[in-house]
């Protein structure tokens, strides 16, 4: 009887751990939809629309090679300064590698980005922390590192 109870506890614990690391299909698709929207906005040269994927808050953090930038406005300014025209922006594609739940309304996503440009192409890796607010997912932290 003790062996059955131990097995049952291990089984319940493993289900609990599994459920804590996997998002529902609906939440995963919602996050991917935001990324798709951002990709389309970027490829249209529209940084204003691209920024809709980020939480519009001073709590937003963007970390890149220049160190952390705090706040939605400062993050937008960084994008506008770094990508002043569509030639430098290029065509963006995302490749999602992993998406996991951290808590009920928080998830992280690891992926690669690729910029196809008439100048030099660029690619790199990113880790995004997402927060679900009033049923919508927003990026609250973005750490992006360029390989080129």
What residues fall within each predicted segment?
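Bacterial Sec-dependent N-terminal signal peptides
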Residues: 1-23
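Short beta-strand edge/turn micro-motifs at domain boundaries
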Residues: 123-148
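Short, low-complexity N-terminal intrinsically disordered segments enriched in polar/charged residues
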Residues: 16-53
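A mature extracytoplasmic/lumenal domain signature
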Residues: 55, 66, 98, 112-113, ...
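A short gly/proline-enriched turn/hairpin at secondary-structure junctions
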Residues: 59-70, 84-87
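Surface-exposed, charged secondary-structure patches
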Residues: 76-118
């Amino acid at each position: 009887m003790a062996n059955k109870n131990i097995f049952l506890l291990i089984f319940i614990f493993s289900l609990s751990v599994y459920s804590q690391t996997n998002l529902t299909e609906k939440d995963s698709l919602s996050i991917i939809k935001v990324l798709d929207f951002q990709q389309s906005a970027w490829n249209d040269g529209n940084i204003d629309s691209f920024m809709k994927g980020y939480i519009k808050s001073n709590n937003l953090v963007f970390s890149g090679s220049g160190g952390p930038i705090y706040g939605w406005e400062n993050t937008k300014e960084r994008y506008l300064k770094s990508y002043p025209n569509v030639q430098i922006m290029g065509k963006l594609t995302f490749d999602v590698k992993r998406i996991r739940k951290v808590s009920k309304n928080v998830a992280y996503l690891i992926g690669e980005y690729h910029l196809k440009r008439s100048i030099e192409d660029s690619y790199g890796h990113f880790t995004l922390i997402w927060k679900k607010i009033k049923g919508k997912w927003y990026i609250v932290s973005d750490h992006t590192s360029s390989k080129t």
